[in-house]
């Protein structure tokens, strides 16, 4: 019996040894329960298979056909991307074990149910749920995600926002509701208190709101009043938006950017609504349906950039205010923005014009009209010396306190009239007088023909009056009525001398005597070369001058800000709704055993920040991510590296559209490899060990040599004791016999 049992065991085990190796069948399979207690869960392979080590900080699970998030995710995760999967529901309590999670991206899933509530990640600041199947948002019962700053719901079939829909997020700063179904249907839209907090107070933290691609017909003051800190409002590609009017911006004084481009139904903008936005900097209305764009009171000290390209504008001098004061307003693509004449119009607006031509056309038309309607104001005796007008036709002057820092100001009185046709000039009040009718009768000779005409008049011993620098010109009531609250740079040359002003004449003739009640108008050269040089010194650079911008300079001011400040030219940049190009990684310097400094160059794209991803060679799954880096940075240190290790590092650019995609090759590759130096501690330990070994070897060798030397000394002493004399010869002396 004892011999039979081993034989049976050998017989049973023999096929497993002889057959080829087969796939191992696990003894246990891991099963996972549904997210909200689903009982119909089949046994599946472990979802944790292939996940990185427990200390990973960033993980991408895109395109894995996941129906739920794995429950064995590393607790150290800070960024999780599970886009393009089959997720159907999300509950914040499921993510409670990810205490360090900050960014969660779940774009392009099938999420149709949300549950806000306590127990979610306390540090989560970015949640992207774009392009899912959310038809409604769950009610907020408390501050579920108190640290959430950015929420993206773009592309969801949301039809309405209920009151206090975002009260769960008291720190929310950016909300993307673009391409949703808001406004579609009878009950669709935004409720009156949709952006109110838990206690009904305004959502004071929200700064950026994107409603592009929705079906809203208008912006209602009932819901926008709860956004007092709003700085950017995006209303792009809205097919039903028809008008902007009312007191919609009364409670949003911090608004800086309004983007309504590509909204084809937008036909009316009551521009006076912008009087409540003193910090306004950008207005984008390209490719809308606007026919006019009247001025309003500009109280802002910022330079306002306006884009009206692609609108069916009607030619009128009412639009010339956009080009009057380049220090206050900048019209983008003025040469490409066209206006068409009104039906049945004649005169200067008989054909289509670009808006850049309006000032010259309006100036020529106003000069001719005023010259024909006011001939009694010009008498020959005074005209040769300086044009004078009666008090009823007093020239427009600059407001009191406005300083002029050029020696010769351009004489553009007629241009001032053309720039403000909405003033009392249309009501019969005589505006500022023009110079010479002959000099301005034809706009085709502007400006040199006008200068020639004035030169001929000055040849008749007319004194040339020149304003000294830093002259303060006080305003008259008529000038204030004409200009209203819009100070302009064109009216600097037309001023009435005040007691504080200094004037001097050329030596050819004395100052002309003025009749009582007359006000002098100074005739100066228009656009002389000397004047242009001085303008360039005291004014802002020309638009054709490239900006002082280098894409690789650390802490480089963004080119858009340089352009607003200096009126210079920036390189072409892709929009903020386009995924940015990858940065160009310059290299890695200052490499030590545990740190390195990464350098890169900015791409030709709008960038809101950068991100650095790096991993040790052979450990691509265990990738570390450096959070959002400021857009002005061009270098960033990496710490906590392992000594003597080769790393692969990539720099990514980020904007509203997402992160740039790294290129595998090319001179603009955003990735590079570098190796850290060996540890100094290990090197010192090795040197110490080698030194100790050498010392020990030296001691042992010395001991061996000493011992051997002693042995040789004893042997030499024994040799000296040996007698070489045979004692036998002492008793028997040797006798030498002589052979005869």
From Swiss-Prot:
Q: Polar residues bias: where?
A: 430-454, 490-514
UniProt key word Transmembrane helix: yes
For biological process, the GO terms are:
long-term memory; visual learning
Q: Which residues lie on this side of the membrane: Extracellular?
A: 19-679
Q: From the UniProt entry, list the residue stretches annotated as the region Disordered.
A: 389-517
Q: What is this protein called?
A: Leucine-rich repeat neuronal protein 4
Its subcellular locations are: Membrane
What InterPro entries does the record tag this protein with? Answer: FN3_dom, FN3_sf, Ig-like_fold, Leu-rich_rpt, Leu-rich_rpt_typical-subtyp, LRR_dom_sf
Q: Where in the sequence is the signal peptide annotated?
A: 1-18
In this chain the LRR repeats are located at 51-74, 75-97, 98-123, 125-144, 145-168, 174-197, 203-226, 228-251, 253-276, 277-300
Q: How does it sit in the membrane?
A: Single-pass type I membrane protein
- List the Cytoplasmic topological domains: 701-740
CDD domains per record: FN3
Identify the main location.
membrane
Its Gene Ontology cellular component terms are: extracellular exosome; plasma membrane
Native species:
Homo sapiens (Human)
Q: What sections of the protein cross the membrane?
A: 680-700
UniProt keywords, alphabetically: Glycoprotein, Leucine-rich repeat, Membrane, Repeat, Signal, Transmembrane, Transmembrane helix
